[in-house]
Structure formats: structure tokens, C-alpha cells
Regions:
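Oxyanion/phosphate-interacting regions
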Residues: 1-8, 163-169, 186-256
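N-terminal subdomain of lithium-sensitive/metallo-dependent phosphomonoesterases centered on the IMPase/IPPase/PAP
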Residues: 1-80
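Conserved beta-strand termini and adjacent loop/short-helix elements that scaffold enzyme active sites
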Residues: 27, 61, 178-180, 223
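Active-site-adjacent structural elements in enzyme catalytic cores
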Residues: 51, 66-135, 211-214
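Residue-level detector of anion-binding/catalytic polar loops
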Residues: 55-57, 174, 194, 219
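Short, Asp-centered acidic motifs that coordinate Mg2+ and/or phosphate
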Residues: 57, 107, 145, 194-195
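Acidic beta-strand-loop-alpha-helix segment within the catalytic core
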Residues: 98-185, 233-256
Length: 256
């Protein structure tokens, strides 16, 4: 399996993200939705990747597909990260596919069809967008932009997150909320922002993008400062350099 094969499969899958005519269903509440495009993209990806790597497992957002513990190699898939954005015609929505080997990511692809930005990385080989090498910025915390969000699916954590975000806002330059984890981590990887925080995410939200970020020179961990769990939900913090990472981690720990 090569990164170029994976890129080709992801690009083909994007053809199933129709611009109109998709069905919308609620999953766990009015905030969490799934479209018929999510299901179609995931089914296509699983079928194609199973043909190329028959012995691999899958950890996917839709249909509760999870046999990651049974396989040496596991595909971690979010068919559309930012489904709410997708359903409203907002550009920040992405197909995310990562290949996990043991406890580490080996490949990651994040594709934003509406902006035609294909982010990808292989372990130890750098990070790229549309064939061009990308790298994090060198901006300091006080000149940095923080990408973040309130916990729309876990509103019981709203007060904690608000305190963290307000504290960080007083120390950084500005804040952005794009409504999709993977695109935001890729933006960090290419220098469009410098800081990232979310209180609780699923592994398919961040797995593929986490490799792209680290290969671009960034740092990412759980909200407690531990290595990311690639099979269970986790809080996530990330930054463009060690000093900014430590400052953001201190803010998160102070309010958690």
C-alpha cells in the first residue's frame, strides 16, 4: 500500500460527496447528524481498502465499525469530518483516512474537496499539501491564532472549556472556529494557525491529521499532556513548537 494509492482512493471517494440531494439523520441528538454521503463515502473507503489490505481492521465513525484490537494494521476513518459544515455548504469538511500500525500512525490523508486541498503524510517522510512540502509557523504564543470550539456534543463541559478558551484568548493573538478538527490541525501544520484545543474528540477526528501535523514539525497530545489514544476518545491540544505547547498545556491544566 502506497500513499499515492491511498490519495487516489480518497479522491475517488470525494465524488460521493454530492452537493445536493443527500439525506440527513440525527444520531445522538439534534447537534450530531449523519448524511447519506457520510455512509456512502465510508462504505466505498472500507471496500477499496479491504481489497488492497485484506488483513487490516477498521475504526470508523459511522455504523459503529470497530475491530481495531484484532488487527496489526487498522484504518481509522472519518468519512466526512465536519458533517454539519458539509450539510450547510461550508468549505471546512474533509475525508480523513489514517493507517495505524500497532500504536503509531503510519499514513494520514485529509482531503477538503470544496477547496481541493489534499493533505498527506507518511511517518518519517514529511507532510504535504497538493504535492508541496508544508511546515508549521514560527510565531510565538502572543502572535498565535488558536483554533478551538466549545464541546457541542458534550455541553456538560461548556464552563470548563469556556474558562480555558478565555484564558488562552487573553494570551494569544486571536481565535478561530472552523467546526472541523482535521482541517484545523492541517491548518496548524501549514502555518495558518499556531494553537489547537478541544476538550473531547473521537480518534477518527484527529488520527490522520495528527501524523500530518507532527511530520510538519508540530506537537500534539491529549489534553493531559499524554500521548494521543488512537482507539478511544480524548481531549486534544497541539501547537507549532514546544514553548507554545507548554504554555497551552499549562492553561488547560489550570482549569481542568
Amino acid at each position: 500500500m502506497t500513499i499515492q494509492q491511498l490519495i487516489a482512493i480518497v479522491r475517488d471517494a470525494s465524488g460521493l460527496m454530492v452537493t445536493d440531494g443527500f439525506d440527513i439523520e440525527q444520531k445522538d441528538g439534534c447537534e450530531n447528524i449523519v448524511t447519506s454521503s457520510d455512509v456512502a463515502v465510508q462504505d466505498f473507503l472500507c471496500q477499496q481498502l479491504s481489497l488492497l489490505m485484506p488483513s487490516s481492521g477498521f475504526l470508523c465513525e459511522e455504523k459503529d465499525r470497530n475491530d481495531a484490537q484484532l488487527h496489526e494494521y487498522t484504518w481509522i476513518i472519518d468519512p466526512i469530518d465536519g458533517t454539519a459544515n458539509y450539510s450547510r455548504g461550508i468549505d471546512q469538511c474533509a475525508i480523513c483516512v489514517g493507517l495505524k500500525h500497532g500504536e503509531e500512525m503510519e499514513m494520514g490523508v485529509v482531503y477538503l474537496p470544496r477547496t481541493d486541498e489534499m493533505f498527506y503524510a507518511e511517518k518519517g517522510k514529511g507532510a504535504f499539501c497538493n504535492g508541496k512540502s508544508i511546515h508549521v509557523s514560527e510565531r510565538a504564543f502572543n502572535n498565535g491564532v488558536l483554533c478551538t470550539a466549545l464541546p457541542v456534543y458534550h455541553k456538560e463541559y461548556t464552563d470548563i472549556c469556556s474558562r480555558i478558551i478565555i484564558d488562552a484568548f487573553h494570551q494569544c493573538n486571536d481565535i478561530r472556529r472552523f467546526g472541523a478538527c482535521a482541517p484545523e490541525l492541517c491548518y496548524l501544520a501549514m502555518g495558518r494557525c499556531e494553537l489547537y484545543f478541544e476538550y473531547l474528540l473521537s480518534p477518527w477526528d484527529y488520527a490522520a491529521a495528527s501524523l500530518i501535523l507532527t511530520e510538519a514539525g508540530g506537537i500534539i497530545s491529549s489534553a493531559q499532556g499524554c500521548p494521543l489514544c488512537l482507539t478511544e476518545p480524548s481531549g486534544v491540544i497541539a501547537a507549532n513548537n514546544a514553548a507554545n505547547y507548554r504554555q497551552l498545556l499549562d492553561i488547560v491544566k489550570r482549569h481542568s
